[in-house]
């Protein structure tokens, strides 16, 4: 078994690649399942050996890709605590927050290629859970939109400023109303633990969604 520290960036990049690829699929699937956009803009694809729905809308896809492209260097440095998909009503108040809590161990234990295969199996379980999450959530009001939030560790601020200059992608401090909901209903969806990554997904759902 090989043990690497967080400073071994080559493997840190592998972890970031795996996670960002997963998050891209997960965001698309959340938008489809929660009917944020018309189903006509989605096409069925196969990811992690299961069917998923991916958007064909260029601007939407670019927003998701650009966000994750800028998040990737922060994940490499273990500076990301949460990635959140916030679904907003017409008044731009959050009705649902899909929260991906991310933790990486300071030492990465790599035993074999089977580890990555195991991680893929764990991520597949997340995708399957997202695909049926509407069974435990109330319907959202019509006309919803969404935004992506990234919760970082305090030390990440300088890195974000550098990335903003390099990538020409503006980071904006989130509005307080996007970050918090009053007394939301908490719905745990899935948790995974592996030698390279720990992650849990839960939904914060507003008690009254009707507008």
Curated annotation (Swiss-Prot):
InterPro entries for the chain: HORMA_dom (IPR003511), HORMA_dom_sf (IPR036570), Mad2-like (IPR045091)
Domain HORMA span(s) in chain numbering: 13-203
Keyword Ion transport in annotation: no
Record keyword Aminoacyl-tRNA synthetase present: no
Keywords, in A-Z order: Cell cycle, Cell division, Cytoplasm, Cytoskeleton, DNA damage, Mitosis, Nucleus, Transcription, Transcription regulation
Assigned GO CC terms: cytoplasm; nucleus; spindle; zeta DNA polymerase complex
Pfam families on file: HORMA (PF02301)
Biological processes per GO annotation: cell division; DNA damage response, signal transduction resulting in transcription; double-strand break repair; negative regulation of protein catabolic process; negative regulation of ubiquitin protein ligase activity; positive regulation of DNA-templated transcription; positive regulation of peptidyl-serine phosphorylation; regulation of cell growth
Compartments, record wording: Nucleus; Cytoplasm, Cytoskeleton, Spindle; Cytoplasm
Protein role: Adapter protein able to interact with different proteins and involved in different biological processes. Mediates the interaction between the error-prone DNA polymerase zeta catalytic subunit rev3l and the inserter polymerase rev1, thereby mediating the second polymerase switching in translesion DNA synthesis. Translesion DNA synthesis releases the replication blockade of replicative polymerases, stalled in presence of DNA lesions. May also play a role in signal transduction in response to DNA damage.
Subunit structure: Homooligomer. Interacts with rev1. Interacts with rev3l. Interacts with fzr1 (in complex with the anaphase promoting complex APC). May interact with cdc20.
Protein name, per record: Mitotic spindle assembly checkpoint protein MAD2B
């Amino acid at each position: 078994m090989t043990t690497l520290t967080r400073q071994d960036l080559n493997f840190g990049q592998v972890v970031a690649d795996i996670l960002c690829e997963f998050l891209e699929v997960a965001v698309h699937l959340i938008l489809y399942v929660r009917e944020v956009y018309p189903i006509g803009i989605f096409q069925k694809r196969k990811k992690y050996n299961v069917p998923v729905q991916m958007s064909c809308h260029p601007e939407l896809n670019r927003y998701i890709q650009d966000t994750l492209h800028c998040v990737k260097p922060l994940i490499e440095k273990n500076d990301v605590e949460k990635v959140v998909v916030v679904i907003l009503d017409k008044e731009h108040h959050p009705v649902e927050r899909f929260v991906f809590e991310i933790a990486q161990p300071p030492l990465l234990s790599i035993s074999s290629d089977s580890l990555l295969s195991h991680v893929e199996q764990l991520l597949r379980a997340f995708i399957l859970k997202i695909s049926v999450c509407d069974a435990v959530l109330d319907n959202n009001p019509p006309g919803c939109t969404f935004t992506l939030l990234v919760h970082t560790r305090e030390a990440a601020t300088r890195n974000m400023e550098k990335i903003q200059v390099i990538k020409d992608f503006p980071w904006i401090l989130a509005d307080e109303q996007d970050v918090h909901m009053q007394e939301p209903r908490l719905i745990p969806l899935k948790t995974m633990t592996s030698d390279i990554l720990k992650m849990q997904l839960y939904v914060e759902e507003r008690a009254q969604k009707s507008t």
